[in-house]
Design a protein with these regions (language model features):
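N-terminal ligand-binding/catalytic initiation module
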Residues: 1-158, 379, 385
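Solvent-exposed alpha-helices and their adjacent loops that cap or buttress functional pockets
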Residues: 15, 58-63, 99-100, 125-127, ...
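Glycine-rich phosphate/diphosphate-binding loop of Rossmann-like nucleotide-binding domains
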Residues: 77, 84-102, 154, 160, ...
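General beta-strand structural signal in soluble alpha/beta enzymes
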Residues: 108, 134-137, 158-161, 192, ...
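Adenosine-phosphate binding glycine-rich loop
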Residues: 161, 286-392
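Rossmann-like adenosine-cofactor binding region
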Residues: 235-306, 311-313
Length: 392
C-alpha cells in the first residue's frame, strides 16, 4: 500500500481552496426587503435593543456560538516560533474542527506581537465579539499568566487547549487504562515527564481526579519542594503539590516502581530498560510528536501493558480533538463564564464513557474522534458540571 504524503496533500489542498474556512450567511439576502432587514434600516433596531440590554447580544447575534482561536505563533506544533502568518493554517484547521465536530463557529486570529501585555490587551479588545476564547500555541511560561489574567478579567470562558485539552484526554485514557489494568486511581504512582504547559496541566488534573502520588520531571530532574528556591515560579508551584516524598534524581530514578508514565517532552527519552523497573502492568503515554518518547513496539517489548501516543498510526491515539469541541459546545450552551476544573474532569469522564467496559482492552482505551457523537457526549458532561457548580 502506497504511503500517503500528507505534507504534500495539505499543501495541495491549501493552494486549491485558499484556506479551510469561509463565511456563509444564515439569512436570505435575495431581495431589497431582505437587504433592509439584514442591514439598514432594520439592523438599527437590533443594535438599539442590545444597547438597552447587553445580554441580548447572546440572543440576537452570533456571539452565542462563536469562539476565537487566538495565537501569537510562538510555539506552533513542533515548528516553534514561526510567527503570526505561518500560524494561520493551524488556527484555520482548529476552527474547521470546531465546526465539524461541535457545530461551533470560530474565527482564527493571529497576533503580530509576542508581548504578554499586548496579547492580553488584544484579546480583551476583541472579546465582545465572541462567546469564548481558545488560546493556541502560546509558549510557557507566558501562557500561564496570559490565560489566568484573561480568565479573571473576562466574562466569557478562556481555555488554553495546549495545556488543558491534552490533560483532559490523557485523563480519559487513564480512567480506562486503569480499568483494564485493574488498578485504583488513588493507589497509583505517576511520573509526568515534561514541565511545560501540558505536563503541568496533566499533573494538576490528575491530582483533581484523585491521583495521590505524582512526580513531575523536567530537564533539571525530579521537581522537588526542597529545591523550590532554585526553580522558576511555575515549577516551584507544582513541586509544592506533587512529589510528597521530596525525591530528587533523574527520570530513570523517578520511574522505579511507577505505574504510569506520561510523556509530554521529547523523542526517545524513555529507555526500554527503565520500563522494566516500573510496577506491574505499566501504562505508558508517550505523546511527543512527531516521534514519541518511545515507540509502542519498543515499549511493549520492554514489558509495557498499555501504550498510548499522540499518533493516528498506533493504537490508543490521545488527541485533543476528543475534548475541545465538546468542551466549548457545553460551555457556550450554558453561557458559562469559566471552564472549571470540575467541568474538565467531567469532560474526561465523558470521553472515557464512550467505550463500554466490555469493549475495553489494552489496545482500545480511548475513542476515535469519528466514533459516535463524541463532542455531544462531552458537551452534555460539561453542561451538567457547569450547572452543578453554578457556572451556568
Amino acid at each position: 500500500m502506497e504511503k500517503k504524503d500528507f505534507n504534500q496533500l495539505a499543501l495541495d489542498q491549501a493552494k486549491e481552496f485558499g484556506g479551510k474556512l469561509s463565511v456563509v450567511s444564515k439569512v436570505p439576502i435575495e431581495t431589497r426587503d431582505d437587504l433592509s432587514i439584514a442591514y439598514t434600516p432594520g439592523v438599527g433596531a437590533v443594535s438599539s435593543a442590545i444597547a438597552k440590554d447587553k445580554s441580548l447580544v447572546y440572543d440576537l447575534t452570533t456571539k452565542k456560538n462563536t469562539v476565537a482561536v487566538i495565537s501569537d505563533g510562538l510555539a506552533v506544533l513542533g515548528l516553534g516560533n514561526i510567527g503570526a502568518e505561518a500560524a494561520m493554517p493551524v488556527m484555520e484547521g482548529k476552527a474547521a474542527l470546531f465546526k465539524r465536530f461541535a457545530k461551533v463557529d470560530s474565527i482564527p486570529i493571529v497576533l503580530d506581537t509576542q508581548d504578554t501585555e499586548e496579547i492580553i490587551a488584544a484579546v480583551k479588545a476583541v472579546a465582545p465579539t465572541f462567546g469564548g476564547i481558545n488560546l493556541e500555541d502560546i509558549s510557557a511560561p507566558r501562557c500561564f499568566e496570559i490565560e489566568a489574567r484573561l480568565i479573571e478579567e473576562l466574562d466569557i470562558p478562556v481555555f488554553h487547549d495546549d495545556q488543558h485539552g491534552t490533560a483532559i484526554v490523557v485523563l480519559a485514557a487513564l480512567y480506562n487504562a486503569l480499568k483494564v489494568a485493574g488498578k485504583d486511581i488513588g493507589d497509583i504512582r505517576v511520573v509526568v515527564n515534561g514541565g511545560g504547559s501540558a505536563g503541568l496541566s496533566v499533573a494538576r488534573r490528575f491530582l483533581a481526579a484523585g491521583v495521590k502520588h505524582i512526580m513531575v520531571v523536567d530537564k533539571v530532574g525530579i521537581l522537588a519542594e526542597k529545591n523550590a528556591d532554585q526553580l522558576p515560579p511555575h515549577h516551584a508551584a507544582i513541586a509544592k503539590i506533587t512529589n510528597h516524598e521530596n525525591r530528587t534524581g533523574t527520570l530513570e530514578d523517578a520511574l522505579q516502581g511507577a505505574d504510569v508514565f506520561v510523556g509530554v517532552s521529547a523523542p526517545h527519552v524513555l529507555k526500554p530498560e527503565w520500563i522494566k523497573t516500573m510496577a506491574d502492568k505499566p501504562i505508558i503515554f508517550a505523546m511527543a510528536n512527531p516521534e514519541p518518547e518511545i515507540f509502542p513496539d519498543e515499549a511493549l517489548a520492554a514489558g509495557a501493558y498499555i501504550v498510548g501516543t499522540g499518533r493516528s498510526d498506533f493504537a490508543n491515539q490521545i488527541n485533543n480533538v476528543l475534548a475541545f469541541p465538546g468542551i466549548f459546545r457545553g460551555a457556550l450552551d450554558t453561557r458559562a463564564r469559566k471552564i472549571t476544573i470540575d467541568m474538565q474532569i467531567a469532560a474526561a469522564k465523558g470521553i472515557a464513557s464512550l467505550i463500554p467496559d466490555a469493549e475495553l482492552s489494552t489496545t482500545n482505551i480511548i475513542p476515535n474522534a469519528f466514533d459516535g457523537d463524541v463532542a455531544e457526549v462531552v458537551a452534555e458532561s460539561v453542561r451538567h458540571a457547569a450547572e452543578a457548580t453554578a457556572e451556568a
